Amino acid sequence: MQVYLERARSRQQDFLYPLLFREYIYGLAYSHHLNRSIFVENVGYDNKYSLLIVKRLITRMYQQNHFIISANDSNKNAFWGYNKNFYSQIISEGFAIVVEIPFFLQLSSSLEEAEIIQYYKNLRSIHSIFPFLEDKMTYLNYVSDIRIPYPMHLEILVQILRYWVKDAPFFHFLRLFLYNFCNWNSFITTKKSISTFSKSNPRFFLFLYNFYVCEYESIFVFLRNKSSHLRLKSFSVFFERIFFYAKREHLVKVFSKDFSYTFTFFKDPYIHYVRYQGKCILASKNAPFLMNKWNHYFLHLWQCFFDVWSQPRMININPLSEHSFQLLGYFSNVRLNRSVVRSQMLQNTFLIEIVIKKLDIIVPIIPLIRSLAKAKFCNVLGQXISKPVWADSSDFDIIDRFLRICRSLSHYYNGSSKKKSLYRIKYILRFSCIKTLACKHKSTVRAFLKRSGSEELLQEFFTEEEDIFSLIFPRDSSTLQRLHRNRIWYLDILFSNDLVHDE
């Protein structure tokens, strides 16, 4: 494995630091984030971003005595002279643009090499999750639900990046930047601090975090390929693929005592690995102790190689028929439908029990209500409340905002096998919309509905998304009937709904 890592890291890039002073780098970042207005300058600079100010900020960072600055300093201090958080976004955007350039070039060159594509031929796009759930899950028996741990300190992310990029001034400046903005005086960076940094510098943080995930996944793929490509050895049992030669003789002796015969070979099952955001699942058809082996690999990999502490309770192995796992904002499990069939052969009659596995994909109502309560559409009990911050808009805009949220949820959860459970969410949004309109007109809900006659208009909240297909297919069409009965996955749902993203 060490040889593999050294070979993969041999393609390192130099001289990234001078790019931080190139004006076109910040021009690219400005064009990419124009609507976010993070490059608008402070008062007195004519509301334009300036490379000169960025250079001055970099110079001040080098001249500042870091032993004087406290981690609890206010957003404005003598070091900056301006808004600290505001200009940190400017520099972090420049960091993200610069550091993405060599990896984009490396990816482009790698795609041209046939052996790279052949090596990663089992990797799939994120959109392949949907056919995986539909086609594979009913044939699997065990699932391991894993939450990927966050690094305890951002220095770990920087060290991982150092394996790939050799540029001492660049990393010196990177540490200097993180020291000023991420409370590096603390031995352990709290999850709250990381969350604050990720929200204020989303592009830069996502690059560091995704690079950390990509690094451990590349090692996992390497171990998986090595374990599945071993030749069959007679009269041997291989549970551990790492250092298995030393354990071969001992394992054979142990199993010879416990069983009346010796196994010829114990082959690993095909492991399905799926990751989305900060969670991943391992699914397998065979015995759970092999799943437990891979879970131990993950724990040791995170703790020993990445210095990331992960508690064993963050990894759970459960039968799919008894446990629901959360992925893509859904609760999914495999339900066993049992039926008894009467059969007769000659004069003998007997009963046959048939077990059919069916994939259940359920809408997580309680987490959705928590998300709506956090967004101030209802309270924690699911009782709809008004949205006063929208009361200044016109009636049409208020209704349109609520309808877009409701249709987005319906669009997202069209893959559910029980769409009627969404009626409660639609009712909360509908009643919150009515209360917001009544609050705007300074009236009660009943008086507002009686005066404006808006009840028929608000029935759009309960319009099913499949009804749109009735405009394309005839009402008696078999295609339309299948659309109402089956699940429909839309490929754009990975980006459309912020309420259901895994945290």
Curated annotation (Swiss-Prot):
The keyword Ribonucleoprotein does not apply. Keywords: Chloroplast, mRNA processing, Plastid, RNA-binding, tRNA processing. One of its GO terms (molecular function) is RNA binding. InterPro entries: Domain_X, Maturase_MatK, Maturase_MatK_N. One of its GO terms (biological process) is tRNA processing. It holds the Pfam family Intron_maturas2. It is found in: Plastid, Chloroplast. GO terms for cellular component: chloroplast. Usually encoded in the trnK tRNA gene intron. Probably assists in splicing its own and other chloroplast group II introns. Belongs to the intron maturase 2 family. MatK subfamily. This is Maturase K. The lineage of its organism: Eukaryota, Viridiplantae, Streptophyta, Embryophyta, Tracheophyta. The gene is matK.
